[in-house]
Amino acid sequence: MNRRKALAFALAGFALATLAAAAAPPEPPGYRLDDYQSPTPDTFNGEPALSVEAAKAAWSDPKTIFIDVLPHPPRPEGLPKGTIWQEKPHAGIARSIWLPEVGRGALAPETEAYFSRSLSEITGGDKDAILVFYCKRACWMSWNAAKRAASMGYSQVRWYSDGIEGWREAGLPTETIAPRP
């Protein structure tokens, strides 16, 4: 009887692993244009997404640049004149730079120019700087932003797919960050 249970558990584990592997979609040829909070590929440019351990190792090198691409919530419309509105603090991976909105599938020309200019400024024009893009777990915006940076000629682009949630769960340092102007 114990053999049967062991075999059943082994088969169940194999089935779950197979289903989990099948759940990850392949890398698309272009950008994801909608449904950003959905299953993401396990890879970026054919390379595995950074694990928490790999992201932590990359972060330990102060030359590595972590970039948060989570959108910035706008000021609510229709607030009466003179209303004081205070933004909710945004926690990011410590030492990261927040470039909101740059992970959408289609960017307005102004947003694309902002992204290009920001990358040039934060890397000092070094197209070989190591860039790690993140957002939330299973968020296509960070994948899109990484793809866009690579298309701009940046050669050391990495994608951290577990995002801020994975970082926090690992007990790694975070800090309140503001959007880069």
What are these regions (language model features)?
Residues 2, 9, 19-53, 58-61, ...:
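Rhodanese-like catalytic fold shared by cysteine-dependent sulfurtransferases
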Residues 7-14:
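Sec-dependent N-terminal signal peptides
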Residues 55, 65-70:
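Short hydrophobic beta-strand that contains or immediately precedes a catalytic carboxylate
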Residues 73:
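Glycine-rich nucleotide phosphate-binding loop and flanking beta-alpha elements
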